[in-house]
Amino acid sequence: MNSFYSHLAGATVRWFDFQGQGDPIVFIHGLGCASSYDYPPVVSNPILNGRRALLIDLPGYGYSDKPLQFGYRIADQAAVVVEWLNKLQVSRCILYGHSMGGSVAIEAAQRLGKRVESLIVAEPNLYAGGGFYSCKIAGQTEDDFIANGYQSMLAEETSPGKGCLQNSAPWALWRGATSLVVGASPSWFERFIHLQCRKTLIYGSLSLPSQEAEDVETAGIALAVIPQAGHSMAWENPAALARVIAGLL
């Protein structure tokens, strides 16, 4: 595992660098998750033909530091991603973001401009309002969530993702969830459809139908579907996700 000190976050950010050929695929995880947990089974699949992959744990999550003073908004996380890629001197990349990470990837792609060869977002938050998970968190005050809601959420969680959740700072979860509920202006949907790089939306078959997916297809952007998977597609069908990503390179 690698690390660098983020001046924007005021903390150390950690990531995996799976060495390989070609422009790297940058994996950005969702709320309460960690790329170090979600994506090794995906990037190690032989179908990706040894493509270099960078798996970042955003500030507040996974192995990265969890500073109390950081904002954790989508824009804040996108700025750290760009700072990190600048530090690595990455001149061209493919951005992949899941859920909250999809929104982060969209904002990062705007900042990176022509350095982004392709943007792949998997069930991202494209509009204000959040989803079930983020609304449940943001429906509490930050103090209440830190004091009580976070532990209640941990107690209720039974999926393998509980390990990621318990390695997520409650203040990062609350501020990230609140940012998703508040949304952005212009919306992430508007930003996504107007980006000039190649773009693809990924959905798990069990998550369809979806209004957001229909809106993106109507805008002329390709939709790829992961069979036998829902929102947590990297856990549910990593081989199929690897195949879809490989087909987009």
Question: Which residues does each PLM region occupy?
Answer:
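Conserved alpha/beta-hydrolase "nucleophile elbow" surrounding the catalytic nucleophile
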Residues: 29, 93, 97-102
